[in-house]
Every structure is written in structure tokens, then in C-alpha cells.
Amino acid sequence: MHKAGFVNIIGNPNVGKSTLMNAFVGEKLSIITSKAQTTRHRIFGIVSGDDFQVVFSDTPGIIKPSYALQASMMDFVKSAFEDADILIYMVEIGEKELKDEVFFNRINKLEVPVLLLINKVDTSDQSTLEEQVAYWKEKVPRAEIFPISALRNFQTEVVFNRIIELLPESPAFFPKDQLTDKPERFFVNEIIREKILLHYKEEIPYSVEVETESFADSETIIHIRSVIMVERESQKGIIIGHKGEALKRVGVEARTDLEKFFGKQIHLELFVKVNKDWRSNARQLRRFGYDTN
């Protein structure tokens, strides 16, 4: 008998969803920073064995959208409810409910298994943890609750084994050697965007999109040309920095991570362009891979 299914991870921003999926997959497929809204897309991470295949789905943190980009991000979360064979609802110690009650109300109405993971228990004491478990048992009575630390890999194997038990009987959805549904250029864009999230403050990181215009792969080196899109001319100057130093730092750090990711030398060219108000432009959002209604 072969088992396979979609295991979709939802939760508020910064609760550890991307860290969890990366831990399960064993590769850094989702970028991770301390900033909210780091994950913008729905990303599949695929784990296959001889008789099973788990398709994990990392999703953007749940927010109440303020503009078209955020609305598109929440559409990715909605789709995670619709095709889940198992839903992982991830919270952190001290957290109370989702930032949007519409999503929270859907959890208790689901017919598929729900695993509620209380993350970051390594930062808590036992009495607080017991209070949290009791609280969530009352709020989501149909969920199985697991205290975990995704960062420390505490209890993640227990959760994974339970997922395997709950998977429906099914053939594999993807080739057994495939790790994700995303193309190489997607990960180039995400790695560059991660460096921008890490090094720039306030609104700048949220006004940025990255597009890879060329990706030329040879036996020993990959030549990459990527464009950092901003919404205003003033943001372009901030991204570039004095004498280009800020952009150079992004390039150096991104190239280092890209070489680790692809396992070969990288020649990376970065450019900055103004794409006015792209976050509210449906055509531009579709161009960057976001669904728009």
C-alpha cells in the first residue's frame, strides 16, 4: 500500500511555519527572517519514501489584507484549506487565535485531520505550556495537539510519524526525487529577497519584488541576472545605498547562499528598477506569480 497527501501548514506570521517545513524536508526551501510576511507564496516541500509521499505546503502568515498583494497572499491560504488531506495549524507559546477569525472558524469545520502544533516550547516553562494545551483543547477540540520546537527539532519526528499514519492511500503526486514544485528562478528571487528583508528597515522590504531575467546554467558556473523592483524612486536610492555599498552587500550575501543552494559557482548581476505601485497592480502581481481575482 502506498500513501500520499497534501499537508498544509497555516498560522499567524512568524510562528515558525517555514522553519517547520524546512526541518521536515531537510532543505531550506522557504526563506526565514524575523519580519512578518516573509513568505509571500505557497511553497511545496516534498518528502518521499518507498511507500509514502508527503507534500508539505508552506503558506503566508495570516493577516487582514490592506492591499492587492496581501489579498493575493491570503488567497494562497484559502487554497490550503481546500486541498488539504491534513491541516497543520501552527501557533506559538502565548498566542491566542488567528489574526483573521474567518480562517479560524474554518478550522473547526474541516473534515480532514487537524494537527495543532504549539511551537517554541523551548522558550516556555511547564506550567505555561500546560495552560496553552488546555486553552487550545477548548478552542479546537477536534485537533490533535503537539508541543514542539521546530528550530530545535523537538517532537518534529513524532509529528512526522503521525502524519504518515494519517495519510490517505494514494499514488505519489510527484516524482520521488523531486523536492519542490518551484523552478530554480523562484529560489534565486527568494534568496535575494531574504537579504533585503534582513538588511533594510520599515516599509522598504515590503515594497520589493525580485525578478530573475536570465539564468544560464553551465557545467561549472551559473550566470544570473536579477532585477530588484521597488515602488518609488526614493526606495531605489535606499536599496542601492551610498556608492552602491548596500546593494553590493545584498549581492555578496545572496551569491554565497546561491552557491550553497545550487552547489556551483555563481555569477550574479543585480539591478534596481522602479515599478510604480506594483503591489496594487493586478497585472504586475500576475506577472510575479500571484493570483488575482
Please name every model-derived segment.
Residues 51, 75-143, 216-218:
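Conserved C-terminal guanine-recognition region of P-loop GTPase G domains, centered on the G4
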Residues 113, 122-180:
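Canonical P-loop GTPase G-domain recognition
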Residues 16, 155, 246:
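Conserved glycine(s) of the Walker
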Residues 58, 119, 149:
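Active-site glycine-centered loops adjacent to acidic/histidine catalytic or metal-binding residues
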Residues 39, 62-64, 96-97, 124-125, ...:
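Catalytic P-loop NTPase motifs of RecA-like helicase/translocase cores
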